[in-house]
Amino acid sequence: VRIVCLLTALLAVSGCGMDAEKGILMAAGAYGDLAVVYADPGLDPVARQFATEVNEDQVFVIASETRFKIDIFPPENWDLAKGYKNAVFVTTAGDHGAVNKELRKLMSKEAWSQLQSGAGGLVQRKDPWATYQLLVVATGPDRNSLASLLHRNAARIRGMIESDSRTRILRHNRYEGLATGLMNSCWSRHGFYLEIPETFQLNQQGHDKVPGLELMETNPSRGITICWLDTEDPAGMLADRTRLVALRADMGRLFHHEDLVPESFTWSDGGPPGHPGVTLKGAWTGKTFAGGGPFWSYFLADKGRGRVYCIDLLTYAPGMDKMGFFRQMEAIATTFSTTRPQP
């Protein structure tokens, strides 16, 4: 157990590894499902306030979705959280109820002692009851201190869940199988590495104006398109939004038969999580059919090759929530590299 001194003590407790996955039940539901459990009836308002603060709206074109689908459970129903991909338990030190009895079984003596003394803190437990699962425990010496801890750390806990979800998604992709032949082709022909699940197929590649390739998964339609433009000044191009939009627009017309909707654009610094770059999010409309949807585009500069890459995530799923699809594709995008990982 390792204690990290940030705003509060954060302890990470390891769960089962890949070798054990065949013998352990996989947690049901989606990576956006979150159970919040309070250990004492008096903590109900604390749990509900935290659920509001840890969540946030995501806008896809004109429809707004919440990042997480949250269910809140009282102490007598704590065991329902065992079926969720993500769970946050909120409790106070010295509580001897059923929730704390279960939590004590899941933690080392060191972790438990840390939470039961002083100012409390946060604990992560990976795969507590099933594989591909994350449990976060928040403990305070009393209700007010717990509420303050959760308020200060809501964004941090959100980030912990999303970061671990990406790790779990990639872990599950590897377990289910990767399209190694297609991955090798991407490396040998185009010079980039990407962990491609077997469920994605190569839909098309190669255009004179915009070189690249499109990976597709159906039911509903989801695509990861990677294109690039050679330039003598990759860093300069990365700072030129007009050129970045032109690259994405040309790719959209050639690969997707679509137009972009400029008034929908939102920009942010950073590429896929863990990568430097620039992100553009917006909407597209079809040129050959009446429909459209959201896209996320990441632009990355490769100074060694003199190239700017665009990694584009797109879905067409009318009437369906989009966040789960983008969460899965974003995890894949984080594996992009121009340096092939060594086995």
Task: Identify what each model region corresponds to.
Residues 1-7:
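Sec-dependent signal peptide recognition
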Residues 12-15:
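C-terminal motif of bacterial Sec signal peptides marking the signal peptidase cleavage site
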Residues 23-153:
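Long, folded non-catalytic interaction modules
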Residues 145-173, 194, 200, 307-343:
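Surface-exposed amphipathic alpha-helical segments
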Residues 171-217:
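Loop-centered beta-sheet repeat module
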